[in-house]
């Protein structure tokens, strides 16, 4: 067998690429992962590590287009768009605007909630069965509101949505939040506690995924910057990288947003 060929060639060694590799290896496939840096670097390494079925609401909702446009004035905005209107960006904004309605919002909420709930339980099973040492905690997540205005807005667009989905969200008074988290500055308006949420240490999680991939016989090529992808018709025939030329019966693109 050609050592550079595998059943599945995965481009990108972040959390998605490594998780795909692990499940494919368990299914009996031979797998090779190409990663331009080191396994799990980038955004898979540095993030808050929360696992949140409570975040079922999509970004596209009525009123959000105005938020997106106003964010162009603040480089530190949570949703920031560079105020440069080229073709692709304008098409994205128009598509985003078309989905900022309640019909699409509720349809997306139901689909996202189903995926989030299933993945939350699958993740717990994976961490337990493969003994992944990543500081996984199922203690829930607490969200704190400093003002009543923000709390009331989140009640309409967040907590009430979760109620309809059957996702538990516990409303807390300000004094209850302060009792739960004594280090908070007094004057909290209220809070939401999501007992179904979880968290982990993302850098440890991706390192553990990489460990299990190697233990099960998978290959991870670090420093493999992709130079070119050769195609024939609608199939990828070869992937040329700084670590060599590779191929696979199937190719998984897990290269991230950038």
Please place each PLM-identified region on the residue numbering:
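Short hydrophobic core segments
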Residues: 10-11, 34, 246-257
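Glycine-rich FAD pyrophosphate-binding loop
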Residues: 26-46
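Short phosphate-binding/catalytic loops that engage adenosine nucleotides
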Residues: 29-30, 167, 218
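Helical element adjacent to the flavin cofactor pocket in flavoenzyme catalytic cores
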Residues: 153-164, 184-250, 254
């Amino acid at each position: 067998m050609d050592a550079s060929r595998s059943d599945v060639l995965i481009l990108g060694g972040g959390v998605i690429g490594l998780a795909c590799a692990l499940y494919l290896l368990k299914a009996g496939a031979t797998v090779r992962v190409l990663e331009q840096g080191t396994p799990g670097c980038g955004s898979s390494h540095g993030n808050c590590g929360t696992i949140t079925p409570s975040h079922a609401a999509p970004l596209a909702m009525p009123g959000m287009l105005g938020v997106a446009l106003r964010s162009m004035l603040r480089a530190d905005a949570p949703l920031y768009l560079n105020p440069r209107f080229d073709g692709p960006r304008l098409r994205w904004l128009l598509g985003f605007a078309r989905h900022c309605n309640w019909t699409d919002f509720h349809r997306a909420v139901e689909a996202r909630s189903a995926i989030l709930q299933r993945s939350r339980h699958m993740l717990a099973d994976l961490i337990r069965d493969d003994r992944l040492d990543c500081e996984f905690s199922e203690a829930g997540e607490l969200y704190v509101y400093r003002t009543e205005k923000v709390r009331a807005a989140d009640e309409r667009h967040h907590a009430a949505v979760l109620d309809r989905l059957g996702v538990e969200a516990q409303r807390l008074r300000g004094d209850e939040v302060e009792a739960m988290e004594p280090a908070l500055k007094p004057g909290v308006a209220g809070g939401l506690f999501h007992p179904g949420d979880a968290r982990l240490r993302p850098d440890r999680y991706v390192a553990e995924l990489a460990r299990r991939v190697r233990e099960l016989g998978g290959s991870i090529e670090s420093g493999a910057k992709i130079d070119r992808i050769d195609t024939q018709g609608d199939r990828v025939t070869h992937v040329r990288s700084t670590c060599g030329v590779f191929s696979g019966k199937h190719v998984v693109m897990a290269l991230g947003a950038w």
